[in-house]
């Protein structure tokens, strides 16, 4: 019996020793699983670098498209204003290409690129999704309404400029309500209208060009409405271009 008891005691001690050794054996395996291999880290860095390059390419492409759209729209709308004898340029400027000052389309194209990139960035920052389904058909309708508002500002005859300004303001807000309806779009549109009107006032004051029958500090009082609706339109174009692009990579 003493031999049996000593044998049983030795077996139990050996079993406990084996159980105690198992966590120590599993620890190196867990450490090996948790520690990333050099090849995995290199692959992750390459993937991050590739996504960053793709994001930059999309950013450049969107900027170019917005610049071209803004420059073309400025050229067409300015021609409409000149034909209606609303905007007056000096004789030497009228003689230039397409009867427009050479600097107007590039400036408007640059502004369109900035505004078009700013709209989706602010939407992403505020976490405010667009309320409507984004599709190019809606964007084209928005552009058509904007061109109609600009054409109406030059063609329609009202008893006074106050009625014209109120009408265009209502149309501009209707454009925002129909195609945007976001707080960020409203705020950016108002900011764009204010800043662009100040810049136009500065240019007119320095004799770069002038308006016929100015009624508010040398410029037309309805001009902020045009800038507001133009900002909303370019913002919708920028939002549409921003769909389906990869997000900007973040380095942890």
From Swiss-Prot:
Organism: Gallus gallus
Transmembrane regions: 60-82, 102-119, 135-157, 161-179, 185-206, 221-238
A Pfam family of this chain: INSIG
Segments on the Cytoplasmic side according to the record's topology features: 1-59, 120-134, 180-184, 239-252
Molecular functions (GO terms): oxysterol binding
Family of this protein: Belongs to the INSIG family.
UniProt KW keywords: Cholesterol metabolism, Endoplasmic reticulum, Lipid metabolism, Lipid-binding, Membrane, Steroid metabolism, Sterol metabolism, Transmembrane, Transmembrane helix
Gene: INSIG1
Entry remark concerning the domains of this protein: The KxHxx motif mediates association with the coatomer complex. Binds oxysterols in a pocket within their transmembrane domains and interacts with SCAP via transmembrane domains 3 and 4.
Biological processes annotated in GO: cellular response to insulin stimulus; cholesterol biosynthetic process; SREBP signaling pathway; SREBP-SCAP complex retention in endoplasmic reticulum
Protein name: Insulin-induced gene 1 protein
CC annotations in GO: endoplasmic reticulum; SREBP-SCAP-Insig complex
Motif residue range(s): KxHxx: 246-252
Major subcellular location class: endoplasmic reticulum
InterPro entries: INSIG_fam
Record site feature (Required for the recognition of 25-hydroxycholesterol), residues: 146
Quaternary assembly: Interacts with SCAP; interaction is direct and only takes place in the presence of sterols; it prevents interaction between SCAP and the coat protein complex II (COPII). Associates with the SCAP-SREBP complex; association is mediated via its interaction with SCAP and only takes place in the presence of sterols.
Function per UniProt: Oxysterol-binding protein that mediates feedback control of cholesterol synthesis by controlling both endoplasmic reticulum to Golgi transport of SCAP and degradation of HMGCR. Acts as a negative regulator of cholesterol biosynthesis by mediating the retention of the SCAP-SREBP complex in the endoplasmic reticulum, thereby blocking the processing of sterol regulatory element-binding proteins (SREBPs). Binds oxysterol, including 25-hydroxycholesterol, regulating interaction with SCAP and retention of the SCAP-SREBP complex in the endoplasmic reticulum.
Extracellular topological domain: 83-101, 158-160, 207-220
